[in-house]
Regions:
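Acidic/His- and Gly-rich active-site-bordering loop/insert found
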Residues: 2-84
Length: 84
């Protein structure tokens, strides 16, 4: 399995670097809601392409929050990933 993961990610290095650069260049200061929301929309596109079930939690004064889940019908403990 470890080798499979290595091949999977190694084969996508250019794509991952491109996406990381795009997201960083979007400039989304925490205090500027519309820029954070624009970033949330872009990240949501990527998550949807990966098969995530999503809920966007609207916020009035700060950027919206994405809650993304995969395989919720499968057994096993969930994994929590928080990003800022």
């Amino acid at each position: 399995m470890k080798a499979d993961l290595r091949r999977f990610f190694t084969g996508r290095l250019d794509e991952m670097a491109r996406l990381a650069r795009e997201l960083v260049e979007m400039e989304s200061p925490t205090t500027v809601k519309f820029t954070v929301d624009r970033l949330v929309e872009r990240v949501a596109e990527e998550l949807a392409a990966c098969g995530a079930d999503m809920i966007i939690h609207p916020r009035e004064e700060v950027g919206d929050i994405i809650e993304a889940r995969w395989h919720t019908d499968q057994p096993g403990a969930p994994l929590l990933l928080l990003c800022h």
